[in-house]
Amino acid sequence: MLRVLHRAASALVMATVIGLAPAVAFALAEPTSTPQAPIAAYKPRSNEILWDGYGVPHIYGVDAPSAFYGYGWAQARSHGDNILRLYGEARGKGAEYWGPDYEQTTVWLLTNGVPERAQQWYAQQSPDFRANLDAFAAGINAYAQQNPDDISPEVRQVLPVSGADVVAHAHRLMNFLYVASPGRTLGEGDPPDLADQGSNSWAVAPGKTANGNALLLQNPHLSWTTDYFTYYEAHLVTPDFEIYGATQIGLPVIRFAFNQRMGITNTVNGMVGATNYRLTLQDGGYLYDGQVRPFERPQASYRLRQADGTTVDKPLEIRSSVHGPVFERADGTAVAVRVAGLDRPGMLEQYFDMITADSFDDYEAALARMQVPTFNIVYADREGTINYSFNGVAPKRAEGDIAFWQGLVPGDSSRYLWTETHPLDDLPRVTNPPGGFVQNSNDPPWTPTWPVTYTPKDFPSYLAPQTPHSLRAQQSVRLMSENDDLTLERFMALQLSHRAVMADRTLPDLIPAALIDPDPEVQAAARLLAAWDREFTSDSRAALLFEEWARLFAGQNFAGQAGFATPWSLDKPVSTPYGVRDPKAAVDQLRTAIANTKRKYGAIDRPFGDASRMILNDVNVPGAAGYGNLGSFRVFTWSDPDENGVRTPVHGETWVAMIEFSTPVRAYGLMSYGNSRQPGTTHYSDQIERVSRADFRELLLRREQVEAAVQERTPFNFKP
């Protein structure tokens, strides 16, 4: 156990950022010595799953297929109902299995050819990896067969699942949620669980650490709802590889992964890998280069479950243009979607090869296959190499910036039809920079390290925007650039930063103006803000008021620039914006914020953690940390308050792991919402109190550690 207090972390961050000696000292273990080679991994002689006290499966397999089988079995035990539902959707049978609520998803996936393409992709896997996919599916089936009462009757019809189902789910998640989403194509915008995605990542080189060991932060921020973004923690060991980390349920490979030699993490990068084309309809077809072209119209249908349990066949009218499948928006606009990477069946195997690479060269060779369609990927290893890659399948475009390609692109001319994509070497990347770290917090790829090593002028303008970097992203750069001699403990403390950077940038102008306002309530609010330490801690009495003011000053998502005296500039990407352009207007906004805070929370000085609660099952504990656009590096997005002024997380920290590549590796982390959501589980709310206390648990890699913590053993036999 390693506990890091919120206040201690805040004090440490403040001290280091302003250049003072650290105000807090942690009880540290002796520095780990670093032999020339990592310790040998445990080599299993039998197949078994050892479950620790937090429901984490430590899966030991005599070979790769056995480990994948055990991993499928473990996922089914922990999340079986949800995985089967996701697999049923990816088959294009959600409407048939569960009715009209799934009809739009079914139409989206069938029109885009996901189930059919998944069958093709499955056949294109290498024989060895196809065997792993089959084994993973077999593990899911075996759990369901052995424990039929633990699987909801609603989803049993999906069984048995196949390796092709595994591919279909991964294909849907990556290519038709992350890269192309129905909301963007249909003009409805992304749903909150997709739009609010975010993550933090750091990799630190040995020269910037106290013990000469590289450090890595894995810290995805996603929706807390139960869906395709729910994370699962696991540990796989065979004689040939070891993988620890987390990934979305239903995936057979761990994307946020590490072992005794190396680790990787991912953040959403916003690469525009899909293009939505506005078609001009004419004479039953569409205009293209001055000619009317007919649509391709393949025959298709699907089944729809009725309220009485029967199903009916429904015809599906599919139209395809030269660009891709065509959809009709609510306003009648015909939109064709073209998705890059539909010729890349090897995403899962590439991830597996990346996280089992024996060297950075091997890792880069796997990355260069360009099968992973999107994401920033950050790497660190025991040899001291760190790397940031703005990864993804990026179309080569002859003209236009990213704003043009994010919108509706004219579909009546071949000048906008892309046919090629960029190789890895064309994309922004940094390896072992002079600053000694790489980072990304969903910012564009222009400040992956500090000082910067390239500029936007070095790349096509359609790759990434030159728009304001969020205050969270700016804080990420500052926390790394302004801190040296990092230990793992200090690294963990910095990860807990929940400073309101926007308060630092605005309160010096707002408070003096509010103090001279004739309204006593405004003056009292100004004094409250002046006494605030500008941290989103549970005992803060001004944080809720500031949040309400910032919502008026910078907009509902806290990202507006108009109110600042000095707007964001690419020339000063981590110190702008700042100042208040119109102090009088800002004071009027404070006046409104006072009323809003009272209405929502009962008082302007209600403690932050009294209103912001971590509630799962019967656990109800105070929360800390805030919105990333306010500058909090540790992120929680809160629901609207209820009638009692209480709100809970809807998005934010899910999996967090901090790794030191010592010998042996040391790692600490948490899965905020627990490691299982299957009915009857005891591992849904069992980590939330630790989240509230910032009490990270040690992640157990060595066999002796696992044996000391084991709560249950599951031996298994696997025969392909």
Swiss-Prot record:
It holds the Pfam family Penicil_amidase. GO terms for molecular function: glutaryl-7-aminocephalosporanic-acid acylase activity. The active site is at S199 (nucleophile), H221, E653. Catalyzes the deacylation of 7 beta-(4-carboxybutanamido)cephalosporanic acid (glutaryl-7-aminocephalosporanic acid or GL-7-ACA) to 7-aminocephalosporanic acid (7-ACA). It is found in: Periplasm. Belongs to the peptidase S45 family. Induction: By glutaric acid. One of its GO terms (biological process) is response to antibiotic. It comes from Pseudomonas sp. (strain SY-77). This is Glutaryl-7-aminocephalosporanic-acid acylase. InterPro entries: Ntn_hydrolases_N, Pen/GL7ACA/AHL_acylase, Penicillin_amidase_A-knob, Penicillin_amidase_dom1, Penicillin_amidase_N_B-knob, S45. It is an enzyme of class 3 (hydrolase). It catalyses: (7R)-7-(4-carboxybutanamido)cephalosporanate + H2O = (7R)-7-aminocephalosporanate + glutarate. Heterotetramer of two alpha and two beta subunits processed from the same precursor.
